[in-house]
Amino acid sequence: VKITDKKAAYITGIWSKLDKKVTTAHALERVFTVYPWTTRLFKSFNGHFKAGDSGVQGHAEKVVGALDTAVLHLHDIDAGYKKLSEKHQLIGVDTQNFKLLGQAFLVELAILFKEGFTPELHEAAYKFFLAVAGGLSSQYH
């Protein structure tokens, strides 16, 4: 997925306006609720998958860090995700989960920005999360 300079500007603009940890925790809760099988690698959460729960908050911090890296390297997300991709493969994360989280983020962005989440912003965010999913899947074999 190629991120154009125009889309990169949209992405950095969106990312700068978010309460990143809150938005990420809500996106994670949405994934865990809609796709309950995604919780299988989070046994330490003891069945607590709400945005405000400590396990979700802790994982949200990690996801925010990974997304911060992607935003800083929009034109080469794969390179920044090599080790993280290897780690996710090692622990057995299904690559489809990355796409599901991206879809949940799109819902959260639409809820947050309402009419401000224009088709152009939606397209940029969609491509960003597709690129992130690709980067996180890049070392799977």
UniProtKB/Swiss-Prot annotation:
CDD domains: Hb-beta-like
GO molecular function, a single term: oxygen carrier activity
UniProt tissue specificity: Red blood cells.
GO CC, one annotated term: blood microparticle
Tree of life domain: Eukaryota
A GO BP annotation: hydrogen peroxide catabolic process
Similarity field: Belongs to the globin family.
Subunit structure as annotated in this protein's UniProt entry: Heterotetramer of two alpha chains and two beta chains.
Protein's recorded name: Hemoglobin subunit beta
Organism: Bathyraja eatonii (Eaton's skate)
